[in-house]
């Protein structure tokens, strides 16, 4: 397992390799398989991501509680209208994040990368960026492998679980993984990939997990949409030469410490934050009544 970001940088620079090379070597060793087989499995995962990110752009899944239905379709239509403030590329990326969130909420097939609650971020980044830059499959696979390396460092120091570390741990981690993957796919350095991951987490440090009625829908879907934007802007900054003063290892340690300091009501219990609002509590009561 890749232990620290510092170790990753040192080994990659010493050997003249990239993060995805290290991840591949480790997977081949641990799973006793071949690179060809690993890349074949990655293709299957990427296909599921593409399907979830695009499914609801022109239709709407119907979820049981209808809290987020139609967000993807509306945002996609707006992105194509030429009126978007942030431009059609970022607006479409948000629509793609919404799409996967809707698929998840309607019990469809998604890839938890790294969690179901943050499952819209990586697919939206991969699909939107591929449409823009026309990445080939190997480049996409290498980006995905890079994200795995970032995730391994996060799990060493912190957690992916909102119930342990808040939404910073879920969407923050997903965004960091996506940002590093994008830097790799665009030809950035190992250091730039890690700076992008650091900046991404810094942007959401302290973000709480407060799902209304305990359902992974609202406000989760907005945090997936903003999460993919976070990944894009953080990758942009890193590729521009902007560096994180605090190295990635320390950023993740800080995220873990912040998560540990959060009160229980703000860690996926459905009690605090928006879940504790009057509207949130009413929805929760209605939800519990339906379950009786």
UniProtKB/Swiss-Prot annotation:
GO molecular function: 4 iron, 4 sulfur cluster binding; L-serine ammonia-lyase activity; metal ion binding
EC assignment: 4.3.1.17
Alphabetical GO biological process terms: gluconeogenesis
Key words, A-Z: 4Fe-4S, Gluconeogenesis, Iron, Iron-sulfur, Lyase, Metal-binding
Cofactor note: Binds 1 [4Fe-4S] cluster.
Pathway recorded for this protein: Carbohydrate biosynthesis; gluconeogenesis
CC cofactor: [4Fe-4S] cluster
Pfam families: SDH_alpha
Catalyzed reactions: L-serine = pyruvate + NH4(+)
Quaternary structure, from the entry: Heterooctamer of four alpha chains and four beta chains.
Family, similarity comment: Belongs to the iron-sulfur dependent L-serine dehydratase family.
Record's protein name: L-serine dehydratase, alpha chain
């Amino acid at each position: 397992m890749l232990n620290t970001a510092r170790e990753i940088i040192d080994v990659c620079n010493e050997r003249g390799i990239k993060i995805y090379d290290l991840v591949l070597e480790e997977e081949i060793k641990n799973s006793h398989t071949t690179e060809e087989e690993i890349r074949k499995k990655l293709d299957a995962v990427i296909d599921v991501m593409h399907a979830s990110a695009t499914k609801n752009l022109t239709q709407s899944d119907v979820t049981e509680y209808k809290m987020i239905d139609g967000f993807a379709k509306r945002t996609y239509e707006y992105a194509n209208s030429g009126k978007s403030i942030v431009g059609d590329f970022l607006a479409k990326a948000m629509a793609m994040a919404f799409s996967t969130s809707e698929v998840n909420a309607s019990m469809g097939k998604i890839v938890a990368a790294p969690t179901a609650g943050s499952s819209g971020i990586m697919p939206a980044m991969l699909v939107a960026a591929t449409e823009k830059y026309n990445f080939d499959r190997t480049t996409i696979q290498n980006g995905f492998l890079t994200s795995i390396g970032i995730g391994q460092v996060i799990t060493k120091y912190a957690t992916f679980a909102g119930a342990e570390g808040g939404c910073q741990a879920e969407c923050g981690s997903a965004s960091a993984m996506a940002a590093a993957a994008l830097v790799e796919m665009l030809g950035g350095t190992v250091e730039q990939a890690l700076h992008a991951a650091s900046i991404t987490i810094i942007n959401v440090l302290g973000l709480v997990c407060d799902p209304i009625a305990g359902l992974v829908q609202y406000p989760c879907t907005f945090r997936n949409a903003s999460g993919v934007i976070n990944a894009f802007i953080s990758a942009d900054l890193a590729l521009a030469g902007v560096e994180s003063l605090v190295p990635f290892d320390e950023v993740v340690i800080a995220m873990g410490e912040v998560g540990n300091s959060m009160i229980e009501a703000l860690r996926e219990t459905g009690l605090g934050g928006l879940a504790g609002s009057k509207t949130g509590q009413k929805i929760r009561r209605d939800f519990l009544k339906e379950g009786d």
